[in-house]
């Protein structure tokens, strides 16, 4: 079974409260998604490997740490996932960025893939899939399946708000993929929206419906 982590840092929870508010403007919503993603990336990257290296400081010779191991790819699920990319890349500037285009049929709630572009060496990279919402889990499962089909082996899923139904669905389909969220909400309503949630993240990010 994969690990599911809710990141309860006070700054994240405070910003998430503003994000949920229906009166928050498009600009503020966009800024907050970016800020929360950057803060979450600290926890998501906690297990990155380090190695010892020798350097000279202005004062003395020293043994210090630097990152080693796998390179990173950040893969947003379009379109709402785009809002989280800059925050992660600010923290991990060497990361490559892929894209997976998914849309959800509003009647069946089933996801459909319409675009995918990934780094050529995706099989060697640690992939962080980003999407603000984990609702039914359909889009996340399909995105992960598309990544695995193209060789990705090391995948994490980072979302802002998750529903229990979506977490269970992803864990059942992909027990090797760890999930990180800023909040675990109560349930999905009859329209497939997370309750209490934050509405349609894509619409609120881009100011379009």
UniProtKB/Swiss-Prot annotation:
Its EC number is 2.4.2.9. Its cofactor is Mg(2+). Uracil binds at residues 194, 199-201. The keyword Lipid biosynthesis does not apply. 5-phospho-alpha-D-ribose 1-diphosphate binds at residues 79, 104, 131-139, 200. Binds 1 Mg(2+) ion per subunit. The magnesium is bound as Mg-PRPP. Keywords: Allosteric enzyme, Glycosyltransferase, GTP-binding, Magnesium, Nucleotide-binding, Transferase. It catalyses: UMP + diphosphate = 5-phospho-alpha-D-ribose 1-diphosphate + uracil. It is an enzyme of class 2 (transferase). It holds the Pfam family UPRTase. One of its GO terms (molecular function) is GTP binding. One of its GO terms (biological process) is uracil salvage. Allosterically activated by GTP. Catalyzes the conversion of uracil and 5-phospho-alpha-D-ribose 1-diphosphate (PRPP) to UMP and diphosphate. HAMAP family: Upp_B. This is Uracil phosphoribosyltransferase. The gene is upp.
């Amino acid at each position: 079974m994969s690990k599911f982590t809710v990141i309860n840092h006070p700054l994240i929870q405070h910003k998430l409260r503003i994000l949920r508010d229906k009166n928050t403007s498009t600009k503020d919503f966009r800024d907050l998604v970016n800020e929360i993603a950057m803060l979450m990336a600290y926890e998501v990257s906690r297990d990155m490997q380090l190695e010892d290296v020798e350097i000279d400081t202005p004062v003395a010779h020293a043994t210090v740490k630097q990152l080693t191991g796998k390179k990173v790819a950040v893969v947003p699920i379009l379109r709402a996932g785009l809002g989280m990319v800059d925050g992660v890349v600010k923290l991990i500037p060497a990361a490559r960025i892929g894209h997976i285009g998914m849309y959800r049929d509003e009647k069946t709630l089933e996801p459909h893939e319409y675009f995918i572009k990934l780094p050529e060496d995706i099989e060697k990279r640690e992939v962080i899939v980003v999407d603000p919402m984990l609702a039914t889990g359909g889009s996340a499962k399909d995105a992960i399946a598309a990544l695995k089909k193209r060789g990705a082996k090391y995948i994490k899923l980072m979302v802002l708000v998750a529903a229990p139904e979506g977490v269970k669905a992803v864990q059942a389909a992909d027990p090797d993929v760890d999930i990180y969220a800023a909040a675990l909400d109560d349930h999905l309503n009859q329209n497939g929206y997370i309750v209490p949630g934050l509405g349609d993240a894509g619409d609120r990010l881009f100011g379009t419906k």
